[in-house]
């Protein structure tokens, strides 16, 4: 069995996949034999591959313990996606769809067909957007896919590039039963400038609200959430670009070679409003407000990262009436950096350290 979930509740944006109860860190995912799993966390961030399915011709799922072509063990399963082959004739497609919560997708695909009996080129552009089922859980995704190839009777060489850009509002806190009892199933506490305490009976006993330059003040409970304030730029932003060079060659009817080179870059950040954080956690000293020493404060932080992942894989196979044998290998390298900034601290009078 396979289960998918999404933070926004509409199947768009940050999504997860489980196979037989196993999470994505134990599921190996490849595209044309190239590893797709994040090299650092070993999960797959599907949000960085918007509408990739529109360029996939075949998808194979192997459940349970096994191995995949990237060499790492998979306890939950393996998924291999094969992208589309070249088209013999030129074509152009425009597809659009619309659904609940202002969810829509637009896709444009064009291809040259076979040129001079050996060359072919294809391009896809996609846009996906949704307001989300969860409050304020909007999603904006853009993606591209392009491939060019040379083909003859025994050899094919294909260069593929694809990538995506995502901007998603945070919706990963989820609502507790007490919160849903007061504010409904679609309540989203991310980006909230509010402290609250909810009694077991399921109503608000006290809420304190704060805003830029303001003071915390007790306010009347509003079950519709109209008195809540939110940090508007609490978003996740990421751009990923992938490059694959694939070579297939048939030496004889029995011997065949498959090889590939790959390179992936990623760059992104997210910002969030944090309430009552210790200043020492961010390398800042306490400060005084009206004669009182302040060691905790509300702040806005920005967490960023950039990374690259590259390598190569190969396999040689031999097949006859009695034997199927293959030998392969791969070599990969990953380099990533995490860094951050404090963008704003409530009532802070000193100089903010940029890092």
Segments (PLM) and residue ranges:
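Short acidic/polar hinge/loop motifs at secondary-structure boundaries
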Residues: 35-63, 82, 179-181, 185-189
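Acidic/polar loop-and-plug regions of large Gram-negative outer-membrane beta-barrel proteins
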Residues: 156-246, 270-302
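A beta-strand signature from Gram-negative outer-membrane beta-barrel systems
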Residues: 51-95, 105
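Hydrophobic, lipid-facing positions within transmembrane beta-strands of outer-membrane proteins
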Residues: 15, 77, 90-92, 104-108, ...
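Structural signature of outer-membrane beta-barrel domains
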Residues: 24, 36, 84, 99-101, ...
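Transmembrane beta-barrel wall of Gram-negative outer-membrane proteins
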Residues: 98-129, 134-173, 182-201, 243-253
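Extracytoplasmic beta-strand/coil segments of soluble accessory domains associated
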Residues: 1-35, 51, 57
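Face-selective signature of the C-terminal outer-membrane beta-barrel domain
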Residues: 238-355
